């Protein structure tokens, strides 16, 4: 059983989305909107301690001990607080099915690995679609993934090595997150794009996402408060 952190992380809550319209978000970073439980992961590698807290401050660490261990193993820093979601959406079969039937030629190997993992991505051809002889294997993979595990999908970096990042612009926090947190079966980083995002939005819609998150590239992090530089919108139908 992984020990939880000594300091009380309950005072820190995730930043909430505001009510601003999408068109009013300046220079947006666009992400798929994740279904799942919003959490902050408090990680201390030196002490081998982690705490995963939801937006109410409840401790979910023991319920998700494998994810806590995976987060500590993935962190290339002494400590961090990472904003993310506990979700099966990154690993479940509905997204996998969308990948193997996608007609979007630009689907990358990284995107395939994000949703299916290394084994699942081996089913796909170089352009993100299986060859004709792979369709049976893809169906077997879909069935295998019906009971997909919950993973942690990181969306933001709140603190790094004891230094709060509240005043650092979002895009820079994203870059720090990419450097600080590796990926694996139970730890992912959300994909994000800048405008124009039409092709990526089509891809995310085909994966089964129901909405999009728009976040100003220069936005700061307001823990526990709503920030109008962040907004959610339903997935466009076309």
Please give the residue ranges for each predicted region.
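Catalytic cores of nucleic-acid ligases and guanylyltransferases
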Residues: 1-238
């Amino acid at each position: 059983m992984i020990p939880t952190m000594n300091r009380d992380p309950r005072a820190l809550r995730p930043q909430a989305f505001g009510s601003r319209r999408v068109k009013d978000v300046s220079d947006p970073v666009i992400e798929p909107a994740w279904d799942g439980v919003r959490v902050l992961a408090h990680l201390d590698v030196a002490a081998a301690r982690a705490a995963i807290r939801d937006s109410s401050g409840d401790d979910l660490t023991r319920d998700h001990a494998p994810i806590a261990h995976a987060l500590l193993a993935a962190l290339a820093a002494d400590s961090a607080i990472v904003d993310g979601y506990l979700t099966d959406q990154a690993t479940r079969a509905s997204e996998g099915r969308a990948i193997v039937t996608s007609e979007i030629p630009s689907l990358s190997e990284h995107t395939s690995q994000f949703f299916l993992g290394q084994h699942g991505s081996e089913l796909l051809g170089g352009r993100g679609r299986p060859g004709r002889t792979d369709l049976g294997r893809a169906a077997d993979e879909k069935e295998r993934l019906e009971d997909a595990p919950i993973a942690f999908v990181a969306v933001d970096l709140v603190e790094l090595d004891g230094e709060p990042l509240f005043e650092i612009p979002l895009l820079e926090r994203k870059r720090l997150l990419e450097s600080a947190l590796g990926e694996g079966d139970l730890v992912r980083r959300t994909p994000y794009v800048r405008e124009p995002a039409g092709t990526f939005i089509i891809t995310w819609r085909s994966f089964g996402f129901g909405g999009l998150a728009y976040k100003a590239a220069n936005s700061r992090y307001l823990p526990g408060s709503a920030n109008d530089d962040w907004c959610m919108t339903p997935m466009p139908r076309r």
